[in-house]
Amino acid sequence: MGEGQEYEEVLGAKNITIEYEVDLIDQIWEDRPSLSKKPCFFLEDKYTGENVASKLKRVREKMAEYGATVHLIASLDDNAWLLNFRGDDIDFFPLVLDYVIVRKDSVDLYIDDSKLNDRIREEMAKNNVNIHPYNDIYEDAKKIGADEVALIDPMKMNYALYKSLPCKVVEGANPTILMKAIKNAVEIENIKNAELKDSIALTKFIYWVKKNYDKMEITELSASDKLTALRAEQEGYIRDSFEPLQAFGEHAAMMHYAPSKETDVVLKEGGMLLSDTGGGYYEGSTDITRTTVLGHITPELKKYYTAVYRAMQHLSAANFLYGNHGWSLDVLARQQSGI
């Protein structure tokens, strides 16, 4: 939205208007895939630690502070947190394509309702959440009364939806951003449980690699599949939390390298396997990186590994002063190796 406003200001000075209601790409993309139809699931209180009614109450209190009568939320993570449901519309993210309008006494949810199960429908009805077709959001936004005041987050709202509003607009960060960032006691305990489950799976994986790399052919891709399978053994596993990054040997020097059929290599004696992976569970998501040494490695590899470890250890112990940038802290990492 913010970028659109900037274009509007610059182009308006030259008498150029922005046509935001025409999707030119849609007109020429003949084989455009349809939107996801994957089902959603409700996240119960034992995982969230707070029910939908409580969250809506807190959001409405913040709306009142802004003097807002309606609040449009276009960010998927905020909507998922607010209404306590998750989905699988985006690879590796438990999110659902939707929009939400919070009003004083009701909520409008714009979503493909074929994704919703009975448990979600029950909870939505209990909290006076009205369900509408996903694509109706733009026309319905135009129908918001001119006497209403809409709270929107300019960093999380697209330009077309913003321009559809006929009422007064108050700009501010979505209240849900800070709310979901502050974890309650139930969430904290669940995060610990998710990390414990993930640690069990990763420990089994490292043991398996070390015991079998010289007895059977293990590649980067088959190692990824094995770790995913071990995570899936844990209760509450949903999916990997991002694309597994299994990098062996020189591949480990490449930032965010992910193996493919074209680049896949076999794990061998004398190398190191870098595993940057994560698991998604009902309790939370993990992101963990570990390096596994296969057999005996050269003094040179030991030197480089130790240098990286010492750099991270030193940097992690530093006090990050307000206003610091990454480049100003880089010296703390490099000085451990005299560079």
Walk through the language-model features, giving the residues of each.
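Active-site neighborhoods and metal-handling regions in enzymes and metal-associated proteins
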Residues: 1-339
